[in-house]
Amino acid sequence: MGTFEIKDTFYLNGEPFQIISGAIHYFRIVPEYWKDRLEKLKAIGCNTVETYIPWNMHEPQKGHFHFDGMLDIEKFIQTAQDLGLYVILRPSPYICAEWEFGGLPAWLLAEDGMKLRVNYEPFLRHVYEYYDVLLKKIAAYQINFGGPVILMQIENEYGYYANDKDYLQLLKNKMTESGVVVPLVTSDGPFEANLKGGRLTGVLPTGNFGSKTEERFDELKKFTNGGPLMCTEFWVGWFDHWGNGGHMRGDLEQSV
C-alpha cells in the first residue's frame, strides 16, 4: 500500500517525488513487446509510464467490451509494476492521440442529435456505462491498493474544444464514485484560453508543449495555485500530413 499526493510538489509515500515519465501506448504495441519497451523506458531514466485508454478499441460496438490481447490493460499495468515503474492513466472519453475519432466510438454518431464532450445526457450515459466496466478493472491498480497507478487524467486538451465545467465535473464525479482515489489532473495547451477552458477546481492543470519550456511554465504557473508544474506531453517531434511538406524540429536549445 502507498500514497501519492499533490501539494506544493508531488509526494510519494510522504516524500517529495519527481515524475519522469514517458508515453507507451499499450494499444499500439503487441503484448509480446510490452516488457521490452518498458525496460527501455526505464533504462533511459524514466520512473513512470503514461498511457491513454482508447474507448473505441475497448468498446468497438455498443456493449461489446474487449480487454484481451493488445487491449489487456491490466496486464500492461502489472508488467510496468513488475519492472518497478509507476503508471499514469488517461482514461478520457476523448484522447486525441492522433487516433481515429480521438478514441471516441464511431457508433455514437448513429444517434440523432448526439452531442459529444459536453453535458448531454445521452452522451454521458454511454460514457458512464463504459466507465462502469473500465474503472472497475483499473481501480484496483492504484497505489493506495498496492498498485503502481499514481495519477489519472480527466478528459484531454478540453480547453481546445469547449469550456463546459459541468461536463468536466460530472466526469470527475463518476471517476471518484467508481473508486478512483489517486489525484486527478487535466492536460491542456499552455495558453490562457486553453487553461481556462480545460481546468476544473480542485484538479491540477498540466501542460502539453514541445518548445519554449520556461515561457510555457510561466503561463501554467498562473493556474496551479502553488502546485507543481508538470508537462504531460513534451513533443520531441511532430507528424507529417500526406501531401504536405515534412516538419523539421529545431535544436535542443530552442526546445527548452
State where each predicted segment sits:
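N-terminal carbohydrate-binding accessory modules
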Residues: 1-48, 78, 82-86
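Conserved, mostly hydrophobic/aromatic
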Residues: 14, 41, 49, 80, ...
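Aromatic- and acidic-residue-enriched carbohydrate-binding clefts of CAZyme catalytic domains
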Residues: 15, 52-64, 69, 73, ...
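Short, solvent-exposed turn/loop segments enriched in Gly/Ser/Thr/Pro and often Arg
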Residues: 27, 49-56, 90-100, 150-155, ...
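Aromatic-lined substrate-binding rim segments of carbohydrate-active enzymes
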Residues: 34-100, 172-177, 181-182
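An active-site-proximal structural segment forming one wall of the substrate-binding cleft
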Residues: 69-89, 111-149
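Catalytic-core region of carbohydrate-active enzymes that cleave or remodel glycosidic bonds
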Residues: 75-81, 85, 177-178, 210-256
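Active-site neighborhood of glycoside hydrolase catalytic domains
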Residues: 122-201
